[in-house]
Amino acid sequence: MLQPSRRKFRKEQKGRNTGVATRGANVSFGEFGLKATERGRLTARQIEAARRAISRHIKRGGRIFIRIFPDKPISQKPAEVRMGNGKGNPEYYVAEIQPGKVLYELNGVPEDLAREAFTLAAAKLPLRTTFVTRMFGT
């Protein structure tokens, strides 16, 4: 699973996920992409589950590009622990997703196969997504 190798600080504040994606909004590595149309967060497990769904469907053909990385730690307190006594320990990592962000890209596969693979991957994700193709000149 994806997670940062080391961080300057172990814990991070909650923050707010606002705005739309301006960086990472175009298909730039592959021919086809899976783009988020909704705001949310993806855990490292969800990113990996979708990647596995894509790679199983395209078998040996093509190349997958993961355009997101879970770099935000989410802390949790253990079950049945009283309030107070500080913040919980980091349990997992998430990637904050804005609308318009390209999540995955595929190269070297036909369009119909890419569509099917991205449909399977989208079922593993908690966000609404859309299929996009590369605009030449970008």
Curated annotation (Swiss-Prot):
Chain residue ranges for the region called Disordered: 1-20
Residue stretches of biased makeup (Basic residues): 1-13
Top-rank taxon: Bacteria
GO-annotated cellular components: cytosolic large ribosomal subunit
One GO MF term attached to the UniProt entry: tRNA binding
Record keywords, A-Z: Ribonucleoprotein, Ribosomal protein, RNA-binding, rRNA-binding, tRNA-binding
GO biological process: translation
Entry-linked InterPro entries: Ribosomal_uL16 (IPR047873), Ribosomal_uL16_bact-type (IPR000114), Ribosomal_uL16_dom (IPR016180), Ribosomal_uL16_sf (IPR036920)
Cytoplasm is among the record's keywords: no
Subunit structure: Part of the 50S ribosomal subunit.
Stated role: Binds 23S rRNA and is also seen to make contacts with the A and possibly P site tRNAs.
Protein's name in the database: Large ribosomal subunit protein uL16
Origin species: Leptothrix cholodnii (strain ATCC 51168 / LMG 8142 / SP-6) (Leptothrix discophora (strain SP-6))
